[in-house]
């Protein structure tokens, strides 16, 4: 294995090496410093004359007298079922004090998008225990559904709650969570580790933690490490995997940092022009494969800089993924948790995972009616700000009250409150009962008579009388 002393330039986290024999893109590199210490790196770019190497541990102390050795290997993850219950660094090394993982297989982390011909359409409901998601923006197996948040909003709490509570319905269905956090502080890392251990959620999870002071290149590896683990567990052990990636904004910032160090021509707002393609290599690894029992579902979480949904990161994410869940600063200011604004939120594949055989027969029409009633109530708030509530009709006041109760009772729930889908749907019917039946135009009469609280109470009365007599 040849060693080279042909470093010509060190720029930020990058080292430029000349006159090398052909090397592979993504190849691992060992750099030996004059004092004998070593650093690891990865080939980022190759050309006829120059190889660009990104150094994992930073380039402090690296100079033109340092020695570069190309290993002939690429970044791989030690994959094993023993990963479940472990907390790993962003580069896949154990940081929980436990033993190293003995690999059943070492897999390249680059992976590949699923062959479109082999893809199976996402179906079946995943229950998160959060009413605003399960009822109004349902997550289905094989979907990629991002959460658009803002700085200071409780997206980390929501991520932890989903990781604790997420489950698939049906006997014999095994489920696990892969949780990958990128660019987080020590405080956040401590919170994640303690929460997973305290609640017992770690038993069915693999956690990857990349800290803010870790190298930028590791931030680019972390989601790929997580997805490689997900693919192994899903397709080798038939598990249904939910991958939670937070915060993809930190990932994109690392991508921009490395692009700037390489002196590439910037795209929108300084991000590289290939960011769309790069994000697609992550998001498109979710899905279902025909003939395989296991599935991979993704929930990437990102903070929108300046709460701007047109910013390149949420904008490009929205093009690739199948919907979005939007957090609201206004709801957060009201003390509502989780502050999910259901009106701009959307799950494009929701129709494939709800209804008879999945959740409940009334769910699709129930959802349409809930959206319509809440949207009308929110519109009326704007009118009240101009003319005052006294100018509203009795009907309008009912819709205004519905919107308030919807946020207070339906959207708001405890951080450890795990609601099943039946509870969520019944709660929605209780709210719809505030409105006159003639206003429930999006629900068939048979569902009103079956699930409306007024009719359910009538059905319950004979049973209550029998119990009292006995």
Swiss-Prot record:
Gene Ontology molecular-function annotations: ATP binding; proton-transporting ATP synthase activity, rotational mechanism
Superkingdom as given in the UniProt entry: Archaea
GO annotation terms (biological process): proton motive force-driven plasma membrane ATP synthesis
CC terms in the record's Gene Ontology section: plasma membrane; proton-transporting two-sector ATPase complex, catalytic domain
Alphabetized InterPro entries for the sequence: ATP-synt_VA_C (IPR055190), ATPase_a/bsu_AS (IPR020003), ATPase_A1-cplx_bsu (IPR005724), ATPase_F1/V1/A1_a/bsu_N (IPR004100), ATPase_F1/V1/A1_a/bsu_N_sf (IPR036121), ATPase_F1/V1/A1_a/bsu_nucl-bd (IPR000194), P-loop_NTPase (IPR027417), V-ATPase_su_B/beta (IPR022879)
Entry keyword set: ATP synthesis, Cell membrane, Hydrogen ion transport, Ion transport, Membrane, Transport
Subcellular location as annotated: Cell membrane
Main location: membrane
UniProt cross-references to Pfam families, sorted A to Z: ATP-synt_ab, ATP-synt_ab_N, ATP-synt_VA_C
Family stated for the protein in its record: Belongs to the ATPase alpha/beta chains family.
Cross-referenced HAMAP family: ATP_synth_B_arch
Subunit and partners: Has multiple subunits with at least A(3), B(3), C, D, E, F, H, I and proteolipid K(x).
UniProt xrefs under NCBIfam families: ATP_syn_B_arch, PRK04196.1
PANTHER family xrefs: V-TYPE PROTON ATPASE SUBUNIT B (PTHR43389:SF4)
Protein name, entry field: A-type ATP synthase subunit B
Organism in which the protein naturally occurs: Archaeoglobus fulgidus (strain ATCC 49558 / DSM 4304 / JCM 9628 / NBRC 100126 / VC-16)
Gene: atpB
């Amino acid at each position: 294995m040849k060693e080279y002393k042909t470093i010509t330039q060190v720029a930020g986290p990058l080292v430029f090496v000349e006159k090398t024999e052909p090397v592979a893109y993504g190849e691992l590199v060992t750099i030996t410093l004059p004092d004998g210490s070593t650093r690891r790196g990865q080939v980022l770019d190759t050309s006829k004359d120059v190889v660009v190497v990104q150094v994992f541990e930073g380039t402090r102390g690296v100079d033109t007298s340092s020695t570069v050795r190309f290993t002939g290997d690429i970044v791989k993850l030690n994959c094993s079922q023993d990963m479940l219950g472990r907390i790993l660094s962003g580069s896949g090394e154990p940081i929980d004090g436990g033993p190293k993982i003995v690999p059943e297989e070492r897999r390249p982390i680059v992976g590949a998008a699923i062959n479109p011909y082999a893809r199976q359409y996402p179906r079946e409901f995943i229950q998160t225990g959060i009413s605003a998601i399960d009822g109004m923006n349902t997550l289905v197996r094989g979907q990629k559904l991002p959460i658009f948040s803002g700085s200071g909003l409780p997206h980390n709490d929501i991520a932890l709650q989903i990781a604790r509570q997420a489950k698939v319905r049906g006997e014999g269905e095994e489920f696990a969570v892969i949780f990958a956090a990128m660019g987080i502080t020590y405080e956040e890392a401590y919170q994640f580790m303690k929460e997973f251990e305290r609640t017992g959620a770690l038993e069915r999870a693999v956690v990857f933690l990349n800290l803010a002071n870790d190298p930028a290149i590791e931030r680019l590896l972390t989601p790929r490490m997580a997805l490689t683990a997900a693919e192994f567990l899903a397709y080798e052990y038939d598990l249904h995997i939910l991958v939670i990636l937070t915060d993809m904004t930190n990932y994109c910032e690392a991508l921009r940092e490395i692009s700037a160090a390489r002196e590439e021509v910037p795209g929108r707002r300084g991000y590289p022009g290939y960011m769309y393609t790069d994000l697609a290599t992550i998001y498109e690894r979710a899905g279902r494969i025909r003939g395989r029992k296991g599935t991979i579902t993704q929930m990437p979480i990102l903070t929108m800089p300046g709460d701007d949904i047109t910013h390149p990161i949420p904008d490009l994410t929205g093009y690739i993924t199948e919907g979005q869940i939007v957090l609201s600063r206004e709801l957060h200011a009201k003390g509502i948790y989780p502050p999910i604004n259901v009106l701009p939120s959307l799950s494009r594949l929701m129709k494939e995972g709800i209804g008879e055989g999945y959740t409940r027969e009334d769910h699709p029409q129930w959802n349409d009616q809930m959206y319509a009633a809440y949207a009308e109530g929110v519109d009326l708030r704007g009118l009240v700000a101009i003319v005052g509530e006294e100018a509203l009709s009795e009907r309008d006041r009912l819709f205004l009250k519905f919107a308030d109760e919807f946020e207070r009772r339906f959207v708001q729930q405890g951080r450890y409150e795990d609601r099943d889908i039946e509870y969520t749907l019944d709660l929605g019917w209780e709210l719809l009962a505030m409105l006159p039946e003639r206003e429930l135009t999006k629900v068939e009469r048979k569902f009103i008579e079956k699930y409306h609280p007024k009719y359910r109470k009538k059905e319950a009365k004979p049973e209550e009388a029998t119990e009292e007599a006995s």
